Amino acid sequence: MRVVSLTSPPDACRAAAVSRAFRAAADSDAVWSMFLPRNLPRFAKGELPRTPPSSKKELFRRLSDQPALLPHKLMSMQLDRATGAQRFTLSARALQNRAPVASLSNCSKGNKRIFSEAAQFYRVNELEIRAKVQRKMLSQNTTYAVYLVFKLEYVYYEFGFPYEVASVGVAGRESTRLVSVQGNIKDGDGDGNAPHRHIFQGCRGTLSCDAITSGEDIHFPRENADGWMEVELGEFHNDEADDGGEVSISFT
C-alpha cells in the first residue's frame, strides 16, 4: 500500500487491475488521500453531492472529471487526473480590466464552459487585464502555466495593436513575454514561418493586418474544440516551502 501511494493516480488504477488483493490496497482511502490536496478549498453550494463520496477515490474522480466552483462562483478548481495537482480558472468578474467593458454576456449556451458569463470589449485602443491568486491555494512543488481564454469576434472595433506584454510574477521573480491575440498558430504553413494575422471585417470596411515578422518571439493562441482560444501568458514554480504571498498576472 505504501508503494502504491508513492506512485500516481493512473498507476494506482493499473495496480487495482492486477488482482483482488492489489485492488483492495490500490483503491483504499490511505492511497487516494495521498493524491488529494492536503487542504481542499471550500466549494460553492451544490457543487458536490449532498451525500459525500463513498471513498477518497470517488472524490478524486469527481474533482478530476469536471471543475467545481468555489464560494462566490468567481473561481473554479479541478484536479489534474495524472498528477492530482490543482488547476484553477478565474471568471471574468474576478479579473481587473482597464478597457471599457460593454457587457457581461451569457456564454453558457452551446458550450460546456463552467462560467456563465464572459466580458465583451468594444472599441479597444488599450487593453489591460490583471489578476492575483493566493499561492497557498496552489499545489506545492508544482510548475504552473497561466493561460488567457478568449474569443475574438469576426466583426470588431478599433483593435489595432499587434501584440500585448504578458507578465507572471511570484516571490519577487517576474517573467514576461509578447503575446498576440490576432493570430492563430493554425495559420502557419508548417515550415517554421510565423503565422499570419487574420483579416477582420471592421466597422469601416475590411482591414488586413501584415504578418508579424518571424524574428519576433511572439506567442500565439490555439483554438479549442469548443471554439474558444487560449494562449499561454507564462509559467512559474510554486515551491514546496512557499505557502504565502500571491501570484500576480498581467496582460497589458
PLM regions: where:
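Secondary-structure boundary/capping residues
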Residues: 12-13, 31
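The Skp1-binding helix-loop-helix core of N-terminal F-box domains in SCF E3 ubiquitin ligase adaptors
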Residues: 1-12, 21
